[in-house]
């Protein structure tokens, strides 16, 4: 008998294929393979505990790679800070990183939010031609929205 978890993963696999979401497709396939070869009991807890941190580390490596390769150096940084657009980008990068930090805590403390974020991302990609920016920023935005709703509720509650 196929478990509910496997059926859910197969549904996500179909959605990933329909939405042409490569990241979701790879993630679902990796998890299904781990489950089917019987090492899920050992691997899944590790992913749950360390997965987000490892993912953030990989993203950070990708962001720092142009510095390591020499594509971005002090000269480019100096040129960039002379542009008003660069200052907007710098501020945006700071804000997004701070929002995403709140998302990490939300994902760790409220794992069912991950499912809603994945479904929202899939919907946006499949229906609205959106871009999957990842669950951290989505969780961060959700966290901020929840805090604003709580704050507004304190006036009317």
UniProtKB/Swiss-Prot annotation:
Q: Which PANTHER family match?
A: UPF0756 MEMBRANE PROTEIN YEAL (PTHR38452:SF1)
Where is the protein situated, by its record's location annotation?
Answer: Cell membrane
The cross-references to HAMAP family, in alphabetical order and at most eight, read:
UPF0756 (MF_01874)
Give membrane topology per the record.
Multi-pass membrane protein
- What parts of the sequence cross the membrane? 1-21, 54-74, 87-107, 117-137
Keyword Cell membrane on entry:
yes
Recorded protein name is UPF0756 membrane protein BH3161
A Gene Ontology term for the protein's cellular component: plasma membrane
Taxonomic classification: Bacteria, Bacillati, Bacillota, Bacilli, Bacillales
